[in-house]
Amino acid sequence: MPNIGLAWVNPAPLTKPEHVVNFAKQCEAMGCHSMWTIDRVAYDNLEPLTLLAMAAGATQRIRLGTSVLLGNLPHPSHVAKIVATLGFISNGRVTLGIGFGSRESDYKAVEIPFEHRGSRAVEQIALMKRLWTE
């Protein structure tokens, strides 16, 4: 049987904390393999890693993942520490999906140049891996 995961789009104005917890519990109860959240800066969704921390506290088995985290907008050392902490509180159930974004509006919102985002993402992923292993 294939692994099935469900994504939580997390629109901030409509989301309540109990929605996140209930969604995570339902995913697990239905036998889903994973629960995923999205990341956007220039959109009204909630911060995905914090939502996954809530889901970690409400579940025991499902994997928790980002689909995808805009990993080159925040500082990579900060992302690495948050993901390591999430891995700790979830007993290693984290899958980190990182992208470099296709929407210039996310970059404009935080005043980071849109150009060269791919090469920046490669450098930042390397830094995070180093922080997790050294």
Regions found by a protein language model. Name each.
Residues 38, 67, 97-99:
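Structural motif
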Residues 42-45, 66-74:
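Active-site nucleophile and cofactor-binding loops and adjacent substrate-binding regions
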Residues 59, 66, 85:
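Ser/Thr-centric signal marking residues that sit
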Residues 38-41, 65, 107, 114:
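Residues at structural and domain junctions
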Residues 1-59, 63:
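N-terminal beta1-alpha1-beta2 module of alpha/beta enzyme domains
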Residues 2-15, 72-134:
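Flexible, glycine-rich active-site loops centered on histidine and acidic residues
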